[in-house]
Amino acid sequence: MKITNFIFNWIVKEIMEQKIISIKYNAQILFFIIIPGILFSQGFDDTQLWHAEKFEKPINDKTSLALEQDFRIGENMTNLVYFHADFGIKRIINKTFSINLNFREVFEQKGPELTREHRPHGQIAWKRKLGLLAISSRARLEYRIRQDKDPFFRNRDMLSLKYGKGFTPLMLVPYVANEIFYDFKKSKLNRNRFFIGLNIGSIKSFKPTIYFLIQTGIENKEYSHIGILGFKLKF
């Protein structure tokens, strides 16, 4: 009887310990999702939900193909306002540099009008590690072919910082990033995106990312701000 009670008490203790650990992990996730989400819903011209899925298929150890689809729900997360499909090829030059050539088809709701855009683009990316800090950047040149408008080039430069190899058993890797947009047609910067997010490394079948994004538009010296909650799944 004593042995049975000992085993029962031990099982209960283990279950409670695991439950407490689970609650702590869930609380961490909720903190990163809910608190910034509440803050982001205040004082923005719009709040949006973005969801992207990216599929990569290696051809060899240096070359891979990629397919991406991206859905964006705007108007305070009530209507689908944007969708793109992107297909491309990536080539790793060395441990530091890689290049991409892609074609993107974009559909965007602008008021009552659904617009369509063809967007071929190329980019060069760079990455480096300094201890626990991973630094990466990329420069992308897009050629935007839009309905009933003259085509033009746009440049997008992004810098990202990741820290650590993974915290908690969920292997959470925090990061911050900033992306600037330069419109060659208008010869000026007209958009900025600031990201703060988490990569989740504990899932082996795919790589999920959760992030919060503030997008700032610049038009005629006036600023507009959109708060965005985003999810990206990489397979």
Model-derived segments and their meaning:
Residues 1-47, 235:
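Bacterial Sec-dependent N-terminal signal peptides
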Residues 43-93, 98:
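Start-of-domain marker
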Residues 57, 91, 126-128, 163-165, ...:
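Residue-level signature of outer-membrane beta-barrel architecture
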Residues 69-75, 103-109, 128-130, 141-145, ...:
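Transmembrane beta-strands of outer-membrane beta-barrel pores
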Residues 136-177:
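Detector for outer-membrane/organellar transmembrane beta-barrel domains
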